[in-house]
Amino acid sequence: MRRISTLYGVVDKQAIFFSEVVIGISFNSILFLFHIFQFLLERRLRITDLIISLLALIHLGMLTVMGFRAVDIFASQNVWNDIKCKSLAHLHRLLRGLSLCATCLLSIFQAITLSPRSSCLAKFKYKSTQHSLCSLLVLWAFYMSCGTHYSFTIVADYNFSSRSLIFVTESCIILPMDYITRHLFFILGIFRDVSFIGLMALSSGYMVALLCRHRKQAQHLHRTSLSPKASPEQRATRTILLLMSFFVLMYCLDCTISASRLMHNGEPIHHSIQMMVSNSYATLSPLLLIVTENRISRFLKSLLGRTVDA
């Protein structure tokens, strides 16, 4: 009876896990294809649109890697070796770093876009896409430099018996590090994450201040408590602020679960729960952007209309 309940528990987690992957890949594909069509029609993309399309592509890669790792969590065939373990772990970390950097960069560039002409940030408004890509690479290099150890401490499980081992999947484990090395990389990771969250907080706070100032000016000019219709830049700013809030919430939840798992030497099934939480941003952020972006809604309606007419 206990085996049956355990089996049902694993099947339920597996269904949720793969549902998250399928839903996330679907939404990110829609978001990415929309920006591809926009580029083909208009022959240009705003910097923020370019970053969003890159973010969708990064999330597609993250969720694909997550699907491969899920196969070994729920249905291990014991065929994974060190190369597979290290490759998938390194690729997932690389893509997760790019996701964090792109989200941070999106917040910064939206703050620059919203800034008034008198602001010191105005001179950055018309920078080329090459500058934005270079900025992304610089942020990503900083991210990766503070966490390279993780990928190299993952190996295939060759019947290690130590209780201090942490399982990543059924076939892959994280080898324990000595006290000094572990705490050194922990401090570096905290410094890295606080730096990125701090940049997001500063740019988000700046955008909130600009929106509040614009609202007061609009109320003063129109002599009414109702502000006029928001501009596209202001609507985009509110969407990105919502995106930043969701990212920080998921990040804090991921850190809490990760700390709990490390304290209790979590099994692969516990790691799968952490993976579901850590990848929820990649799954739900495109849905948030699709729902709040009028251009995408109109594009989908016209596409569905043509399909029905055909």
From Swiss-Prot:
Q: Which UniProt keywords apply?
A: Cell membrane, Disulfide bond, G-protein coupled receptor, Glycoprotein, Membrane, Pheromone response, Receptor, Transducer, Transmembrane, Transmembrane helix
Pfam families per UniProt: V1R
Q: Which GO terms describe its cellular component?
A: plasma membrane
Q: Where in the cell is it found?
A: Cell membrane
* Keyword Transmembrane appears in the UniProt entry: yes
* Disulfide pattern: 85-172
Q: Which GO terms describe its biological process?
A: response to pheromone; sensory perception of chemical stimulus
Membrane topology annotation: Multi-pass membrane protein
Entry's CDD domains? 7tm_V1R_pheromone
TM region positions: 21-41, 47-67, 94-114, 136-156, 184-204, 239-259, 272-292
Q: Which residues lie on this side of the membrane: Extracellular?
A: 1-20, 68-93, 157-183, 260-271
Cytoplasmic domain ranges by topology: 42-46, 115-135, 205-238, 293-310
Q: What is its main location?
A: membrane
Q: Which residues are glycosylated?
A: 159
User: Which family is this sequence assigned to?
Assistant: Belongs to the G-protein coupled receptor 1 family.
Q: What does this protein do?
A: Putative pheromone receptor implicated in the regulation of social as well as reproductive behavior.
The protein here is known as Vomeronasal type-1 receptor 90
Source organism (scientific name):
Rattus norvegicus
The root-end lineage is: Eukaryota, Metazoa, Chordata, Craniata, Vertebrata
